[in-house]
Amino acid sequence: MSGDYSATRKSENVDTSTTASQEDSSLAPEQPEKLVGASDVAAVSNNEPTADEYPHGLRLITLVLAINLAMFLASLDQTILGTAIPKITDEFHGLSQVSWYGSAYFMCLGGFQSTWGKVYKYFPLKISFAIAVFVFELGSLICGVARNSNTFIVGRAIAGIGGAGITSGSTVILAFSAEPAKRPTLMSTMGVTYCIAFILGPLIGGAFSEKVTWRWCFYINLPIGGLAMALFFLFFRTPSVSTTQDATLKEKLLHMDPVGTVLAMGGIISFILALQYAGVSHAWNSSVVIGLLVGFVLIMVTLAAWEYFQGDYAMLPYRLFKRRVMWAGGIFQFFFVGCYFLLLFYLPIYFQSIKGVSAIHSGVDNLPLVLSACLFIILGGAAVEKTHMATPYMTAGSAVAAVATGLLYTLDVDTSSGKWIGYQVLVGAGLAFPFQNALNILQAEVDADDMSPATSSLYFFQILGGAFSISAAQAAFNNRLLHSLTINAPGVSPLLVLATGASDLRSVFSADELPGVILSYMDGLKAAFAVSVGLVGMAFLSSLHMVMIDSCETLHTTGDDGAWKGKEVKELEVERLYVN
């Protein structure tokens, strides 16, 4: 069962006071084989809520609705911008800062995941989640009223900080809202929420941008966020095991690891700026670009050293990353999810700039991808729950996605609708089917005390993948676009092309200039799609490593001969998880 995602925890996490009879009872061979996840072991150690504490009936339904409404907003902000970007570039006059519109949000969404994980561990869960929603709403308001690109980017960053608290807190709250055996089903509601946001995001963004104003893409967050908070406060009761850790205020603030957060943000900003400048305003071999890239490497090395010496104070605890399932899962999510967000940004640009369709129409054209993703993320969750296997789907999904993104690379000016519809369906299937699997594996292997930092650490890699991928795609797009213009439209000013919004090409350039500009845009988009192929290829390689991890970490309840192995052997195998 090399792909089984339910591996048992380290032996010292199990209550050693359990009697022999209880051990024999819990490990009785006549029971159906069931590998125990971290949550189950934590329950044995009284680290789980009792059955009576779990919400049921209407209370559970309303609580899940409230949490998923908040998650819907954070997810919608990841998808709604794609079809709105061409209109935003029209108003703010240029493409030069497009990568920041997405990266500012993703950078903070990922960079503050671990910080919020510590907040939920050391401060009251209910109040912390409310603050996260408030910060997100504040950032959305700033984006809505922004009169220039810089203010808009600041608003996106603030919304990202709040969004980090929402995504991290939602997972923790739902984990405390269901018994371990029912968590995959409950967590799948988040997958459905992602899907709904992915479906509605491009449509809402296009509709607001064309019929009203793109600013309503952010104003809409305010009433929905208020409703989510009202329902949450009415129906959520903090479980007894979710007590805040006993520590002084100074110790709690140290656990937030502000130095680590600043280093992470500094490194990400250096990398994004280097890609933004390179080949556009500065040559790749210029001192500015080289200095930023060298600075990025040095900051990342400093961050790694700082996190190591911080111990449990680190935003990325080293003891968690000693386990391959933690860092290998993070690497997989970095590349895999990054590919998806890249496509959500650049496919609408393809439809609006190359095909010349409206913002609403581009959202409709993007539906094959998001509808396919919605369907297959549900099927993927059901497959994991049915088979108790996760990693084989990660490998298969990334392989399918690699082929599908390769097909997207073949898109051209005159590609038929049948092809781009089919390609998107295939991409959605490959990327969505194993979308939640790394999280499923991780949450099955950590106890209740580590649920929050482990989950937020995984989200750190996942969301940063979006920031890095969008920036890398923008760099590839800009460089290829500028090079292609010298061939296809030598009489057109490259600066004018960069300063023109993607949906304004046909109104700015003459009939003689437009074909060359469109061809150059297509070359730039092909470069962006090539980045997506590379990302999902790296995800495929990391998924192979995840399979090897599961092969040696899964604890079989029986030996090769079918005989019961017993507790002593299991303890030895659990110890092996921490020395490999």
Swiss-Prot record:
It is a multi-pass membrane protein. PROSITE patterns: MFS (PS50850). The keyword Lyase does not apply. Keywords: Glycoprotein, Membrane, Transmembrane, Transmembrane helix, Transport. It is found in: Membrane. GO terms for molecular function: transmembrane transporter activity. Residues 14-25 have a biased composition (Polar residues). Residues 1-33 are annotated as: Disordered. It holds the Pfam family MFS_1. It comes from the Eukaryota. GO terms for cellular component: plasma membrane. The chain crosses the membrane at residues 60-80, 92-112, 125-145, 157-177, 188-208, 216-236, 259-279, 286-306, 331-351, 364-384, 389-409, 421-441, 457-477, 529-549. Glycans are attached at N285. Belongs to the major facilitator superfamily. MFS-type transporter; part of the gene cluster that produces the tetronate natural products trihazones. This is MFS-type transporter thnB. The lineage of its organism: Eukaryota, Fungi, Dikarya, Ascomycota, Pezizomycotina. The gene is thnB.
